[in-house]
Amino acid sequence: MRRITCCFPIKIHRRQPPSPPSTITLSSYEYSSLAVGIISDLKEEGCDTLLVKLQKDANRKIGMGVGVRDRGILITTVVPGSVAAEKLKVGDRILAVNGRPILDQRSVVKSVKASGQRLYLQIARPHKVHK
């Protein structure tokens, strides 16, 4: 008696959990309430909130590095002589890019790359960093 073996591909479908949304939608009232709450919390922590305008320059890089830390998304490096060096400090916490709250490090990088000639960063800066 001969044995016949059949081989054919088997596809295994695994259910992936849904990805978290990359954007959130808030009404203007919800956004205002959220913003007021965040600013109050930051003041208690000893931080000021600043709106920083960076003008992109074709001859110079923005020159900043960002990273995830326990306090959020922070400026981790600033290249001397860069556009960022004029207004940002290592330790600044990024709250929003071009008016949009940031969710993670990827959203900061994506928003910075997608911005036009002007880049607006809402940051929280600890009082001890001010000069």
Swiss-Prot record:
Say which domain of life the source belongs to: Eukaryota
User: What Gene3D superfamilies does the database record attribute to this sequence?
Assistant: 2.30.42.10
Pfam families xrefs: PDZ
SUPFAM superfamilies membership: PDZ domain-like
InterPro entries, alphabetized: PDZ (IPR001478), PDZ_scaffold (IPR051342), PDZ_sf (IPR036034)
Q: Where is the PDZ domain?
A: 51-127
Q: Write down the PANTHER family for this protein, in alphabetical order.
A: MULTIPLE PDZ DOMAIN PROTEIN (PTHR19964), PATJ HOMOLOG (PTHR19964:SF92)
What is the protein named?
Answer: PDZ domain-containing protein C52A11.3
- The record lists the organism as Caenorhabditis elegans
Q: What is the lineage of its organism?
A: Eukaryota, Metazoa, Ecdysozoa, Nematoda, Chromadorea
